[in-house]
Amino acid sequence: MKLIVGMTGATGAPLGVALLQALREMPNVETHLVMSKWAKTTIELETPYSARDVAALADFSHNPADQAAIISSGSFRTDGMIVIPCSMKTLAGIRAGYADGLVGRAADVVLKEGRKLVLVPREMPLSTIHLENMLALSRMGVAMVPPMPAFYNHPETVDDIVHHVVARVLDQFGLEHPHARRWQGLPQARNFSQENE
């Protein structure tokens, strides 16, 4: 499997880092990373890693200004793309087909080729413009996976929340996260089921 990972300057850099770390442990997945200029700034603000450290997690790292990169062509086959975190600027550009920079171009290619595109939008609150852009992309088949915590898991750390979001992103490609905690039903429902087996 070949996956493109785009990271933009929206807050949420730990999500992108955790995704790359998880994919790094999957030998059957080849990753192509593009970090926007502001993604690099956000990574160094929000994580203990440098942009160089994060780039090293991917099999291939591409210059965000390189419109001639291999992932800018539909003839280079991939299984899809994840933009995590996805800024509202990037989301709007993808919706409009405005392929500014390699993140936007790669997403545009994935869309036109009918491949899987997953966006992890980071903004709050959401304006009508944001929601309309998301709705339009959803109607095009783009998966919107906002980083919502699952409180039924009783997360104790930020990492617990991050791992859950990454697991839900990987679900979109049929990939299993080693730290995924899945809904098992209500405790009383489980007990009733076991008692009646």
From Swiss-Prot:
Coiled coil: none annotated. The keyword Magnesium does not apply. Changing M124T: In strain: DEC 1a. Pfam families: Flavoprotein. Changing R52H: In strain: DEC 1a. It comes from the Bacteria. FMN binds at G9, A10, T11, S36, S87, M88, K89, T90, R122. It catalyses: dimethylallyl phosphate + FMNH2 = prenylated FMNH2 + phosphate. One of its GO terms (molecular function) is flavin prenyltransferase activity. InterPro entries: Flavin_trans-like, Flavoprotein, UbiX-like, UbiX_pad_YclB. Its EC number is 2.5.1.129. Changing I70T: In strain: DEC 1a. Belongs to the UbiX/PAD1 family. YclB subfamily. PANTHER family: FLAVIN PRENYLTRANSFERASE, FLAVIN PRENYLTRANSFERASE PAD1, MITOCHONDRIAL. Flavin prenyltransferase that catalyzes the synthesis of the prenylated FMN cofactor (prenyl-FMN) for phenolic acid decarboxylase C. Involved in the decarboxylation and detoxification of phenolic derivatives under both aerobic and anaerobic conditions. Homododecamer. This is Probable UbiX-like flavin prenyltransferase. The gene is ecdB.
